[in-house]
Regions:
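Basic, flexible Lys/Arg- and Gly-enriched helix-loop patches that mediate nucleic-acid binding at interfaces
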Residues: 2-160
Length: 160
């Protein structure tokens, strides 16, 4: 049984358990792959509590301990859990059998600190635009910048 303190949406509980992303949980619900107390649920937004037994793809959902890894991502590694081009991923850099995923991303040709976790709630807080959490980047440049270029950077750079 998965511990839920109060009534919560089923897809959120599934995602917070570490089983899959919220969007994937919604897809599983719509496709009839989720049961609550033995009853198939296909309604998004269905509410559950701590007494409910949730089954996803014929497996009882169990509470997963939250795991947090602060990882230095080197250049030449993709910030995904798998890569169709066969490139090394951030998960290739660690040894774990847990379903972890990166919080945010760093480009393939960049290096830096990256958080890996199975905590969907924390991930949502950190990356959702409504929370307006700043990200800080340090860039090395070749050459010497002039005054105009420095002023432009000091104003900030908006990245799409």
């Amino acid at each position: 049984m998965f511990l839920v303190i109060s009534m919560e949406r089923l897809q959120k509980v599934i995602a917070n358990s570490g089983y899959c992303s919220r969007r994937k949980a919604e897809e599983l619900i719509k496709n009839g792959k989720v049961m609550v107390n033995g009853k198939k649920i296909e309604e998004l937004g269905f509410k559950v509590d701590g007494n409910d037994i949730i089954t996803v793809e014929n497996k009882i959902l169990k509470k997963e301990n939250k795991e947090y890894i602060l990882l230095y991502k080197p250049r030449g590694v993709v910030t995904t859990t798998s890569d169709e081009k066969g490139r090394k991923t951030v998960l290739d850099l660690i040894e774990t059998n847990k379903r972890l995923y990166p919080v945010g991303r760093l480009d393939y040709d960049t290096s830096g600190l990256l958080l890996l976790t199975n905590d969907g709630e924390l991930t949502n807080i950190l990356i959702h635009p409504k929370n307006e959490i700043d990200k800080v980047y340090i860039a090395k440049i070749n050459g010497i910048m002039n005054g105009f270029e420095i002023k432009t950077l000091e104003k900030g750079v908006l990245i799409d």
